[in-house]
């Protein structure tokens, strides 16, 4: 009898010790994750030097709250509303829209990653699609032009091309603008071909656990330790497979353009500017983002390969290289390798407007 009691006490003691260990580790994990959860590069950036820091921190917190649907399209959960960012009932950033296109309306979707979504924009109107909408609102074209922000954080051609064909076509768009390139360059080739291995599986498990238990941080620390604190979704820079990634990019968008033609939908594929592209002299603040990691220096060079193969998109009537968009701008534009603030979004939108306006007038 006493032996059984002893076993029970030992078992109970063992459980208590494990609980204490888990609790201590979770406390450490919570402290470790504070900076991860609340930091945004734009808060201390010259890009927003005239905006109070408390407002920028509020923006940062809102962007961290945005939830994604972890499907093959990397869509955004619908109906998320904050002060600086709003997601409508279809999962697009900005105001509500109808599935059915209104009469006398030229409907445009802008597809891309976080730079299209506007991960540092001070409002929905100050994203690239938002500024583009303002430009068309001021134009006298004899019809309504509707610009819809279909950008999603982390999106690249592997997720975007199916998203265009399977989801956006149902909204009867007249034009779909593809504004990307950076994510395709940076994301590992293994992610492009669905061979992410143990690292990718661990990333997915931690992500799914976070959806179930959003306040439990231990899995994140374990993941970062196992992955040596690398971006496990994007992987590490792999220049050896760059040509293969470029080929996949061409294949995906050329196929999407073919499908669009069959539905009388126009596609306009654009290569985005990032820090280091074009002939612009970067500022001292921006320079720190290039020199802190040797991989960063190679990314803008790699992006040029995507611009070089634009002519190979034979089924895409419209394509453009926007990597020189900021050539004549001396002020700080980027707060990291590819993200810009409101001013950068406005400059990009003005360039896109000049390219798209003739397409609408021709239509």
Residues covered by each model-derived region:
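N-terminal Sec-pathway targeting helices
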Residues: 2-19
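Histidine-centered active-site loop/cap adjacent to the catalytic His
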Residues: 11-14, 24, 249, 309-318, ...
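Membrane-interface motif at the C-terminal end of an N-terminal transmembrane signal
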Residues: 22-38
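Membrane/wall-proximal cationic-aromatic binding patches
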Residues: 37-122, 126-135, 139-140, 329
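Loop/turn elements at helix/coil->beta-strand transitions in domains of secreted/extracellular proteins
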Residues: 105-106, 141-145, 171-176, 261-268, ...
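Internal alpha/beta domain cores that form substrate/cofactor-binding pockets in large enzymes
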Residues: 107-109, 135, 144-171, 176-223
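Second-shell loop/turn segments in exported
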Residues: 115-123, 149-150, 240-246, 296, ...
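Serine-dependent acyl-ester chemistry module
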Residues: 181-309, 327-331
């Amino acid at each position: 009898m006493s032996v059984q009691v002893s076993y029970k006490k030992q078992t109970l003691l063992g459980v208590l010790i494990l609980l204490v260990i888990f609790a201590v580790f979770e406390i450490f994990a919570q402290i470790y994750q504070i900076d991860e959860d609340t930091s945004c590069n734009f808060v201390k950036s010259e890009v927003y030097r005239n905006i109070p820091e408390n407002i920028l921190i509020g923006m940062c917190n809102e962007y961290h709250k945005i939830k994604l649907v972890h499907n093959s399209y990397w869509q955004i959960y619908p109906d998320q509303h904050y002060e600086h960012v709003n997601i409508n009932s279809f999962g697009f950033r900005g105001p509500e829209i109808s599935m059915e296109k209104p009469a006398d309306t030229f409907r445009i979707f802008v597809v891309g990653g976080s730079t299209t979504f506007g991960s540092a924009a001070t409002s929905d109107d100050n994203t690239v699609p938002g500024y583009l909408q303002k430009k068309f609102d001021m134009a006298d074209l004899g019809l309504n032009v509707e610009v819809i922000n279909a950008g999603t954080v982390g999106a690249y051609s592997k997720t975007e091309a199916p998203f265009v064909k399977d989801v956006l076509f149902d909204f009867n768009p007249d034009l779909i603008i593809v504004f990307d390139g950076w994510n395709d360059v940076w994301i590992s080739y293994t992610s492009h071909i669905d061979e992410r291995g143990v690292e990718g599986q661990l990333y997915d498990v931690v992500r799914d656990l976070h959806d179930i238990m959003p306040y439990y941080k231990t899995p994140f620390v374990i993941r970062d330790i196992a992955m040596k604190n690398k971006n496990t979704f994007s992987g590490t820079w792999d220049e050896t497979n760059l040509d293969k990634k470029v080929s996949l990019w061409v294949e995906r968008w050329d196929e999407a353009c073919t499908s669009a033609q069959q539905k009388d939908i126009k596609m306009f594929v654009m290569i985005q500017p990032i820090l280091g592209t074009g002939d612009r002299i970067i500022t001292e603040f921006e320079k720190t983002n290039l020199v802190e990691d040797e991989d960063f220096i190679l990314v803008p060079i790699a992006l040029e390969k995507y611009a070089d193969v634009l002519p190979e998109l034979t089924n895409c009537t419209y394509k453009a290289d926007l990597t020189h968009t900021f050539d004549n701008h001396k002020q700080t534009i980027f707060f990291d390798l590819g993200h810009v603030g409101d001013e950068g979004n406005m400059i990009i939108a003005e360039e896109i407007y000049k390219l798209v306006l003739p397409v609408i007038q021709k239509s």
